[in-house]
Amino acid sequence: MSTTCRRAAGTTGRVALALLLALGAGSAQAQDAGAQGPPEPEAPAAAGAESSDDALNKALDSTATQWSFQGAWQIMPDYYNDTMSNGETRPDGATDYLQLRIVAPLAFEKLTILPRVTLRHYENAQGQAGMGNTEVFGLIIPKSWDWGSGRTGIGPLVTLPGNKNVARDEWGYGFAAAAVNSSGKWFYGLLFTQTWRAVDPTSLPPTSSDTNPLGIAPFLNFQLGGGFYVGNGDMVARYDWDTKQVYLPIGIRLGKVFVKKKGSWNAYFEYQTSLIYKDWLGSAVKNSYRFNITYTMPIG
């Protein structure tokens, strides 16, 4: 295990506790609200202003027409090392990565385009580090596909070459689609991703096929009051077209949204492990921890 992995595993508990204490700092106001839900914004609400439930759900919505700046650190200190069906020992994946994601919305009369760039810097168990396959994605949402409380969209996805020690040094291409909806304190949806080329060598062993596994990410968030929420996190299930096998993680996310006049901050901690992986011929994380901060800002 790399020095970074050992250090991350040793400090994860303290960092998680510090984050949860920080999130709890703003909960005193929520106590006064009682059964009335989250406290009202500091500034007087204008007529027709969105409710606190809607404002929180919007901060969680990656398909909303708003600027988004995300920074995240994910630590994967240990993996399952059982014997796979092909007789080989299950390999480890990356030990940790830093992620930066930016969304820059383009609003037109008949549609909205959400260009999104995701950069990740990985480190593996051998101590090797470098940039992963940067993703450039453009979600296209026609106005007719937006029904107010939710929307659906689809768009092209391109992956750039990464450092060969931690990623594939080649281009990839594909598409992604999303469908989301909010109802009161609930926010839920489904994301799909399908790419070709640039197959992650730690996810599945390289084969003659250029087809990556299909990514399916259902998500569900519920508001707890006072800006707090709980959800299942980035639970990306994968289906391998070649072996017909499925990998399914499971996790829990606890976060808090701070709604401000010009935008919102979303801070969360997430834990994840592997639920279905026995027939999967790739890595399967045993314990994964993510610390995230995101700032969203409506256009205009």
Regions found by a protein language model. Give the residues of each.
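N-terminal secretory signal peptides that target proteins for export/translocation
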Residues: M1-T11
